[in-house]
Amino acid sequence: MSDGYGLLKGKKGIIFGALDERSIAWRIALACKREGADFVLSNAPIALRLGTLNALSEETNAPIIPCDVSSDDDVKDMMEKVKAELGGVDFILHAIGMSPNIRKKKEYTDINYNWYQQSLDISAISLHRILHHADEAGILNDGGSVIALSYIGAQRIFSKYSDMNDAKALLESIARNYGSRLASRGIRVNTISQAPTKTSAGSGIKGFDGMYTFAEKLAPLGNPSADDCADYCVAMFSDLTRKVTMQNLFHDGGFVTNGISEEMMEDLAKLYSEED
């Protein structure tokens, strides 16, 4: 692992959501280790069986604490284990998202409501549950930083993203709400709206390749990679951003503020001329 700058030297944290080496959370874990942090890794038991988290654990010397973030008892128990392992924590990464409706290719107007509730609970309400039980266990260190990964679907409708548009909107609202309540202790809570990224999770979304190409063509800087996102998260976990909180921070190469690119105009002109 290459040398870093020591931006997180002496800091301890929890990283939720790493599945395999393509995961954004996986790349964030590597970057945090590079910068001197110690942390625990966590994911749902079923994800641990499907993924390769043990390899990341060995590479970063980070213990794994399984946790079903939809269960109060599980999260409460996990925080006690974190307390025993690390004492307090200086940062938390929430990189958790799941939609049975998307996986089952249900249209938004015909979603299964039980699955819908699962999507909201696991992808968004889990952030509230994690912060509540971490605070209750007394492991949130003053001056800490919490980051949850979001997507522009929280503000704009991407039809194939279905109920995850709603889940990300709720996630961002929870981050703002909790951020206002933890600010008196210097604890920051933000979301990072990452561009479409080629991960195992993203590949499960119908039309993902089209979303990725669209964003790549429209963003002036192009789509940032998982490693780019990891470096951004390191900055947000560090003391260099201690006055940034309750924000949704777009990390998308300029996609959110661009109108249309020359490349896209040329592609559209060709497409429409072919149709004529």
Regions found by a protein language model. Name each.
Residues 57, 65-76, 80-85, 91-117, ...:
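Conserved mid-core segment of classical short-chain dehydrogenase/reductases
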Residues 125, 191, 209-244, 249-253:
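C-terminal helical subdomain
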Residues 79, 127, 131-132, 175-176, ...:
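Short-chain dehydrogenase/reductase
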Residues 59, 203-219, 267-274:
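A short C-terminal helix-loop "cap" of Rossmann-like NAD(P)-dependent dehydrogenase/epimerase domains
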Residues 189, 193-204, 257:
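Short, flexible catalytic-loop segment of classical short-chain dehydrogenase/reductase
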Residues 4-42:
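Canonical Rossmann dinucleotide-binding motif of NAD(H)/NADP(H)-dependent dehydrogenases/reductases
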Residues 17-24, 30, 97-184, 194-198, ...:
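Catalytic loop of short-chain dehydrogenase/reductase
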Residues 245-276:
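Short C-terminal tail/terminal secondary-structure segment
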